[in-house]
């Protein structure tokens, strides 16, 4: 299953949007809260010695929050890449299209935060990410819960997030089919954030505990998938202990 590619005018609108200047919403606290939440999840999940590539790295804030020594960011926007170089000169950033960039190196961890909502071809994105993944590497991919589409649009009007062109909104079945076609399989996933705002006590209670409960987890803002190439699961050979009774 390949989702219908957006009309050419719509694709041009997205590419023009990505080429625009790096900017923050009028009230950036919700965006920062979401970024910090994802950073916390990645810090806990990505191995410390992993070579990390973030596709759609923007100004580099998420990549900088990771403790890994080897960190590379790719972004379509030249102004975002320039700003990332300025903010974090010790990290590596390069300009590139998520669907067609090429790197000689293979990475242990590839991060793609909400990219599937904006690229013109989700399958091509997944295939390119997989092509840059080390044999036993992992892709960390996030996407919004489709139930939040209307609240997120209201957030744009309220200045809580940047206004974007029309987005891809894919159901779980569509995503699973796309993962399979790209030769990927889900290792695990995690639903995160019932309340994407820093409200003392309440946010911690909802996001840390209530969001993990059955059924209620389906209302979370976004899902973090951990993917691997199909057929690369690490298998451990069985161990056998042989005990031979003997008489001294």
Task: Annotate each predicted stretch with a short phrase.
Residues 1-46, 140-162, 200:
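Conserved class I S-adenosyl-L-methionine
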Residues 58-99:
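Class I SAM-dependent methyltransferase SAM/SAH-binding core
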Residues 117, 244-248:
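Active-site beta-to-alpha loop of glycosyltransferases that engages the nucleotide-sugar donor
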Residues 123-135:
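A short glycine-rich, Lys/Arg-flanked "PGG" loop and its adjoining helix->strand segment in the class I
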Residues 157-174:
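Acceptor-substrate binding/catalytic loop of class I
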Residues 238-241:
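Cell-envelope/extracellular polymer assembly enzymes that use nucleotide-activated donors
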């Amino acid at each position: 299953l390949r989702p219908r590619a957006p009309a050419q005018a719509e694709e041009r609108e997205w590419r023009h949007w990505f080429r625009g200047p790096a900017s923050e919403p009028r009230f950036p606290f919700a965006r920062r809260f979401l970024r910090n939440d994802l950073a916390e999840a990645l810090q806990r999940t990505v191995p410390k010695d992993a070579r990390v590539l973030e596709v759609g790295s923007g100004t580099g804030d998420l990549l900088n929050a990771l403790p890994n020594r080897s960190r590379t960011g790719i972004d379509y926007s030249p102004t975002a890449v320039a700003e990332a170089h300025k903010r974090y000169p010790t990290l590596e950033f390069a300009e590139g299209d998520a669907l067609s960039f090429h790197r000689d190196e293979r990475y242990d961890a590839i991060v793609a935060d909400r990219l599937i909502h904006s690229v013109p071809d989700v399958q091509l994105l997944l295939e390119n990410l997989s092509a840059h993944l080390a044999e036993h590497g992992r892709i960390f991919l996030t996407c919004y819960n489709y139930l939040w589409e209307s609240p997120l649009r209201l957030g744009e009007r309220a200045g809580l997030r940047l206004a974007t062109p029309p987005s891809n909104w894919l159901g779980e079945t569509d995503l699973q089919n796309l993962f399979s076609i790209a030769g990927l399989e889900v290792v695990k996933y995690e639903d995160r954030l019932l309340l994407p705002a820093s409200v003392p006590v309440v946010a911690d209670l909802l996001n840390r505990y209530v969001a993990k409960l059955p059924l209620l987890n389906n209302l979370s803002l976004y899902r973090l998938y951990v993917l691997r190439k199909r057929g690369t699961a690490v298998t451990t050979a069985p161990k056998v202990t042989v005990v031979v009774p003997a008489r001294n």
